[in-house]
Amino acid sequence: MSKQLIPGPVEGPLADNERLKRESDHLRGTIAQDLTDPLTGGFNGDNFQLIRFHGMYQQDDRDIRPERTAQKLEPLHNVMLRARLPGGIITPAQWQVIDKFAEDHSLYGSIRLTTRQTFQFHGVLKRDIKMMHQTLNSTGIDSIATAGDVNRNVLCTSNPVESELHQEAYEWAKKISEHLLPKTRAYVEIWLDGEKLGGDEEPILGSNYLPRKFKTTVVIPPHNDVDIHANDLNFVAISDHGKLVGFNVLVGGGLAMTHGDTSTYPRKASDFGFVPLSHVLEVAAAVVSTQRDWGNRVNRKNAKTKYTLERVGVEAFKAEVESRAGIQFGPVRPYEFTSRGDRFGWVEGIDGKHHLTLFIENGRLLDFPGKPLKTGMLEIAKVHQGDFRLTANQNLIIAGVPAGEKARIEALARQYGLLDDGVSEQRKQSMACVALPTCPLAMAEAERMLPAFVTDIEGLLAKHELANDAIIFRVTGCPNGCGRAMLAEVGLVGKAPGRYNLHLGGNLEGTRIPRLHLENITEPQILAELDALIGRWAKDRNAGECFGDFVIRAGIIAPVIDSARDFYAA
């Protein structure tokens, strides 16, 4: 018997986060008072959650937590800040400011590029938080709504080659970001000492904001570097003779799930149809407001847009969006994705400018022994005349380099280890979330285990004479999915220290969800299984067949067709 589809909200007692938001005075809470509380390095009560709407998460160093407990000290509370950077574009002048702050005022001294196409500071103590926001504001950056139950940092394809089309798409990413921002002045009042003026009405987000986090992208086919199926709302650029004419709209993607709860699952976004440029902002607001009103505020595990679509039906949700936006979606315009990895090295744009994409393993910019990456980026920022573009794959593009400056930029990149011809294709196609020691949700290592684990995979590929091939490999330390493992050919999801669930069967284009193959296994067990599977792939693959396609064709794993119904099928 099929489940009845009922448009509208979920009835029942609301989750406590709804009380928290309702009583927060439009996200102010008592954050300002907490900043001067000398008894704790953390935030009290509701403020622990409310700071997320201001772009921060309270964390601690889990490596030293037992030691501090033994000394009868509280955890070393600090915050991680995620900047709002629509489309990932940052100037060299801004970079120099964030470099200095990371060096002088963070516990780890690093800049972390993330899968949300922005940067994060890790390990900022409470005494430096207000100064951090003021420092960022002085250079035109904020962290409004990069976390919490709001629309978060808007991603855009990092593709400066088609410079005119990319510029148009980037401008739309900025417009969408601004249109969907919270209107409350809480951020300005608390962090920038702004005057309290009132006028906190939230016409799009509502007084209780959204039921859960909401993620938006703008993507230029054929390059799916933003992984649209990981996001709630996606605008796929449709061009005519190189000129942007509108977008196909896809709604309801998302990768997070909960171990042991089969009501949670990753889901691909659904095609709603085409909209011209004149209706983009209305459609964005209509999708957000429909999710605002119909999303599940009773059970946060089922609160994201993907679950709303499954509960009410795609057609009902789409019709409601059309009604609210005052439009009708046109037929889906043809488009195709052929890749999603970054194009490393130099490329020349149609404007004659040059762009150098750097591989930054796990997005971590730090001065490592023999590879002073952070210093290298600072030295480049001092002389670069264009801008920097952060990618959703945690890499960085030095964009807009004049021909006469190529040699100097490349020399600096090589001098500091930012450009290394010895990096394998496999390493370039691998990434992980931060996980331990800073993420409080991590169940297993991710960023810290990935480099050595990739070396082991490189060894397996070489053993089977596939050293020039690569598998899209991703690790996420918990099932929330920041590392986007649920769109990888081989995805590891942390289950416990040293143990992971092994998923297989994604594809190169990022349009297929991998299925659970083995559960709760150790790294040596994973490598043994991959050894056998890569051996079969080497022996039996069709010409050019990627690993994810092979394991499905060979019957090793069944494809996920409709994840709401078959993700957990045997």
Curated annotation (Swiss-Prot):
GO terms for molecular function: 4 iron, 4 sulfur cluster binding; heme binding; metal ion binding; NADP binding; sulfite reductase (ferredoxin) activity; sulfite reductase (NADPH) activity. This is Sulfite reductase [NADPH] hemoprotein beta-component. InterPro entries: CysI, NiRdtase/SiRdtase_haem-b_fer, Nit/Sulf_reduc_fer-like_dom_sf, NO2/SO3_Rdtase_4Fe4S_dom, NO2/SO3_Rdtase_4Fe4S_prot, NO2/SO3_Rdtase_4Fe4S_sf, NO2/SO3_Rdtase_FeS/sirohaem_BS. GO terms for cellular component: sulfite reductase complex (NADPH). It catalyses: hydrogen sulfide + 3 NADP(+) + 3 H2O = sulfite + 3 NADPH + 4 H(+). It is an enzyme of class 1 (oxidoreductase). Alpha(8)-beta(8). The alpha component is a flavoprotein, the beta component is a hemoprotein. It comes from Aeromonas hydrophila subsp. hydrophila (strain ATCC 7966 / DSM 30187 / BCRC 13018 / CCUG 14551 / JCM 1027 / KCTC 2358 / NCIMB 9240 / NCTC 8049). Component of the sulfite reductase complex that catalyzes the 6-electron reduction of sulfite to sulfide. This is one of several activities required for the biosynthesis of L-cysteine from sulfate. Keywords: 4Fe-4S, Amino-acid biosynthesis, Cysteine biosynthesis, Heme, Iron, Iron-sulfur, Metal-binding, NADP, Oxidoreductase. Belongs to the nitrite and sulfite reductase 4Fe-4S domain family. Siroheme binds at C482. Pfam families: NIR_SIR, NIR_SIR_ferr. Its cofactor is siroheme; [4Fe-4S] cluster. Pathway: Sulfur metabolism; hydrogen sulfide biosynthesis; hydrogen sulfide from sulfite (NADPH route): step 1/1. Binds 1 siroheme per subunit. Binds 1 [4Fe-4S] cluster per subunit. Its EC number is 1.8.1.2. The lineage of its organism: Bacteria, Pseudomonadati, Pseudomonadota, Gammaproteobacteria, Aeromonadales. GO terms for biological process: cysteine biosynthetic process; hydrogen sulfide biosynthetic process; sulfate assimilation. [4Fe-4S] cluster binds at C433, C439, C478, C482. The keyword Heme applies. The keyword 4Fe-4S applies.
